[in-house]
Amino acid sequence: MHFVLSVAVTLKDEAKVLARLKPGVAAPFTFPKAPTLPKARFDHPPVVVGAGPAGLFAALTLARAGVQPILIERGKPVEERTKSVQMMQEQGILDPESNVQFGEGGAGAFSDGKLTTGTKSPLIRTVLQTFVDHGAPEDILYIAKPHVGTDLLKGVVRSMRQEIIQLGGQVRFDTRLTGLMMRGESMEGIMVLCGGETQEIRTDTVILAIGHSARDTMQTLFRQGVRMEQKPFAMGVRIEHPQALISQSQYGKCWTHPALKAADYKLAVHTPDGRGTYTFCMCPGGEVIAAASQPDGLCVNGMSYHARAGENANSALLVGVRPEDFGDDHPPVSYTHLRAHETRSNL
């Protein structure tokens, strides 16, 4: 067994050292700088819909630019949301507006807190640093597979909300988008449902960060003419195994060494028809949790706490679903297709 490390070092005479080394051994490196945010002005506060990762970062960025945004979220703040999730796990009682999918932090808040992307964006460092500034472990800045953990991520999310408010922004929970107020092609505001009453929020700028599971909101937006297009997605099941089995398989005879953390894995295969099947969101030392957001549905997800000290490991086993599988290029057909598979699976 061996380990692969990439190390960044600071040297007095970098050019001299590089000249002595063989090509490919080392190269100059500079951490990407965080973008400078220009101060912006709007006639009305911009509205961000959804307090998942995209919405939180959008609202935080606007707040840092001096804009004082309004962030609305149909679910509850993470403190109250935790109680709703516990009620579902322990008693099987679902709150359709506050669950593993809906609420502050989005689905990721109760889904392990792995930070992963297939891109090489220079903004990655800024995102990771923001998490650290709000309480995430500093090691996410340099480990290959950064992981916060569900237990720590809740505090990070709460801290990000507090910064938005301190900078003059608003965060409104239990507030669901029900429609856009348009005059021709111009945005004049949005309609929301809050406390059982319909309210209007005047704005000319709306950022939609509604996530994966707000299908009612997606259908409303489509009926109002918001441009949408079908895209590939994946669906599948969760597989679970003893963590000892995975660690022994990956580490061999060294698997019990105290310096080694719970092992993970990633598998992928392309079937003869070209469709991909692969594992995703592997949770070492984690658990499978109930993750439904609809009263008539059954869904599971995987998560780990920061220590990853549980007895079992789990992973999603997914298969790709392509737009040509839907049989129609009408955007809502993709939801109908997905719903049909979900219904058959539940039955």
Q: Model regions: which residues?
A:
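Conserved N-terminal/central alpha/beta ligand/cofactor-binding core
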Residues: M1-L5, E80, Q86-Q170, T175-R176, ...
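Beta1/beta-strand and adjacent pyrophosphate-binding region of the FAD-binding site
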Residues: F42-A51
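Short hydrophobic core segments
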Residues: V49, I201-G211
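Glycine-rich FAD pyrophosphate-binding loop
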Residues: V67-V85
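A conserved short coil-to-beta-strand element within the FAD-binding core of flavoproteins
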Residues: F173-S186
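Flavin (primarily FAD) binding-site architecture
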Residues: S213-R223
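Mid-to-C-terminal "cap/lid" subdomains and adjacent gly/pro-rich loops that border
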Residues: Q230-V321
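Conserved small/polar residues in nucleotide/adenosyl-binding loops
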Residues: T336-T343
